[in-house]
UniProtKB/Swiss-Prot annotation:
A ubiquinone binds at W164. Two distinct, membrane-bound, FAD-containing enzymes are responsible for the catalysis of fumarate and succinate interconversion; the fumarate reductase is used in anaerobic growth, and the succinate dehydrogenase is used in aerobic growth. It is a peripheral membrane protein. Binds 1 [2Fe-2S] cluster. This is Succinate dehydrogenase iron-sulfur subunit. Residues 139-169 form the 4Fe-4S ferredoxin-type domain. [2Fe-2S] cluster binds at C55, C60, C75. The gene is sdhB. GO terms for biological process: aerobic electron transport chain; aerobic respiration; respiratory electron transport chain; tricarboxylic acid cycle. Part of an enzyme complex containing four subunits: a flavoprotein, an iron-sulfur, cytochrome b-556, and a hydrophobic anchor protein. The complex forms trimers. It comes from Escherichia coli (strain K12).
Amino acid sequence: MRLEFSIYRYNPDVDDAPRMQDYTLEADEGRDMMLLDALIQLKEKDPSLSFRRSCREGVCGSDGLNMNGKNGLACITPISALNQPGKKIVIRPLPGLPVIRDLVVDMGQFYAQYEKIKPYLLNNGQNPPAREHLQMPEQREKLDGLYECILCACCSTSCPSFWWNPDKFIGPAGLLAAYRFLIDSRDTETDSRLDGLSDAFSVFRCHSIMNCVSVCPKGLNPTRAIGHIKSMLLQRNA
């Protein structure tokens, strides 16, 4: 089976502007490999092709890409989901972030927004307790669907609000984590966390477009979490 690709290429050291480059790959009939497998084979032919990868199991979040116009992880996206008769598989870097080279983007702004929400437990500056903080099962269950994020940035880079205000809007990934700590029974800084999210941009630039839900490789729902944060802010200010 002959696979055809159109891949975004840009090397700032030698290129004046980005371009799309065509590749072909012969694949075994009946064998459905993942896109990352195909990219690795293409890189064997063209060592200049750059992309990120690590675990190859959908755990590390390193290989987020835009594939046929939709964000996702290359390592868990089968070629059969992308290949259409008579059409090329179009691969681009995650949108909305500066391109370092080819399919590698600068994640600095994404991580900066994530850092703003203080993604760790706070306890009023007290010394760590002598033993772990205990939780009831129902308290722990509230965190399901919130802690599993792998920071691949597929959600935030699919969000128009993040494209338009990347330095002000926290983004879906950061706000999902923010809600995870807001409702954690072991955290004592709910008010200060809400203070940090109370401006006009951090949370309320989310317009519930739900691109983030559509592309999340872990099946999480950042839009729902953001809605809960909005409710907490509005109730506090009522």
